[in-house]
């Protein structure tokens, strides 16, 4: 009971101080296709190298001009300040999940040229070359889901076409369904800590509602049976409870979360909730006016927030126009800062920039 009371008291709370955030631009990936930027790549640190793989963009014509989206298979690694083409993914993939695990990356799900995939791979770097090992597939195809790691447990949450919450143990990589979301949520942000799983934002593709809420569920061994059987969210006594809401009243659709070494969740980017919600109801006649706006008019989030599970409070880490992105790749740096790679500047237009964030 104390846990839930503390959540209610902390709901929407943002610490009054702002940490000092430093933004440092990195070398661009030396490739003509990536020079136009990509969104939703796999992104993580393998060993000491930043890895950016896959992703999607509109390389020939813009979305406004009716251009076709292209999805990539390239694997790029930033080693000693220089980009190396480390190999190719088995499939051209975007909108998947990336987990950093013991010097390797686990790449799960995503969209392969218009089709949601259930494939999972382990990626390691050996002498600058990517080595990929197939892992057990997901129980169902997943993309645009939330993902998070807590100790030796990996979690995937929602996304396109599913309300499932799946978990696996590092080293075994056998995914089991451990819960269901109370509603479909595409592009939520997930975070696991202390035996609880948090979910923020996302949009419901059935009702077209864009969430500004947070949810939390106990997901430790005292609640989840050993056989990881499903906890149905539609039961009268749903295990989901309200968590502290998104601090600026917006949504985390299009945002990317990463767990910092100090145990907090950092969230980068995201769309403007009101503008995105209106766009979900656009008619064909609205398409050209909507896509013709300047990037600043979409009001993507510049602020970077951190959630502390110990206090139940959000802290503003800083704000910078460079962070006004949707679908950026985000990875935790060895020094505790973040790498940010690509993302959308506006619908259909990607950023080619990569940068680091430090506090």
Residue ranges and their predicted role:
Residues 1-7:
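Sec-dependent signal peptide recognition
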Residues 19-359:
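Kelch-like beta-propeller repeat domains
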């Amino acid at each position: 009971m104390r846990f839930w009371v503390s959540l209610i008291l902390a709901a929407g709370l943002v610490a009054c101080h702002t940490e000092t955030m430093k933004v440092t631009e990195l070398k661009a990936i030396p490739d003509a296709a990536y020079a136009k930027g990509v969104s939703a790549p796999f992104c993580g640190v393998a060993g000491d190298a930043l890895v950016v793989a896959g992703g999607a963009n509109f390389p020939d014509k813009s979305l406004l001009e009716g251009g076709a989206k292209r999805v990539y298979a390239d694997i790029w690694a930033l080693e000693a300040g220089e980009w190396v083409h480390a190999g190719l993914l088995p499939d051209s993939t975007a909108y998947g999940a990336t987990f950093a695990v013991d010097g390797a990356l686990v790449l799960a799900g995503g969209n392969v040229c218009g089709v949601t995939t259930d494939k999972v791979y382990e990626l390691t770097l050996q002498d600058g070359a990517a080595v990929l090992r197939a892992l057990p597939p997901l129980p169902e195809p997943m993309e645009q889901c939330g993902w998070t790691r807590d100790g030796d447990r990996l979690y995937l949450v929602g996304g396109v076409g599913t309300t499932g919450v799946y978990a696996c143990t590092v080293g075994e990589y056998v995914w089991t369904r451990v819960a269901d979301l109370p509603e479909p949520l595409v592009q939520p942000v997930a975070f696991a800590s202390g035996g609880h799983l948090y979910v923020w934002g996302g949009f419901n593709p059935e009702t077209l509602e864009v969430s500004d809420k947070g949810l939390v569920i106990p997901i430790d061994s005292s609640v989840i049976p050993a056989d990881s059987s499903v906890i149905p969210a539609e039961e009268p006594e749903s295990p989901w409870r309200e968590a502290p809401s998104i601090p600026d009243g917006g949504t985390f659709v299009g945002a990317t979360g990463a767990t910092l070494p100090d145990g907090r969740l950092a969230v980068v980017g995201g769309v403007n909730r009101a503008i995105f919600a209106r766009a979900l109801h656009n008619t064909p006649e609205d398409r050209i006016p909507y896509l013709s706006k300047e990037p600043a008019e979409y009001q993507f989030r510049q602020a970077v927030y951190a959630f502390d599970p110990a206090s139940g409070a959000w802290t503003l880490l800083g704000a910078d126009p460079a962070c006004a992105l949707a679908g950026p790749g985000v990875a935790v740096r060895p020094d505790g800062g973040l790498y940010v790679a690509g993302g959308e500047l506006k619908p259909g237009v990607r950023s080619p920039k990569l940068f680091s964030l430090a506090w």
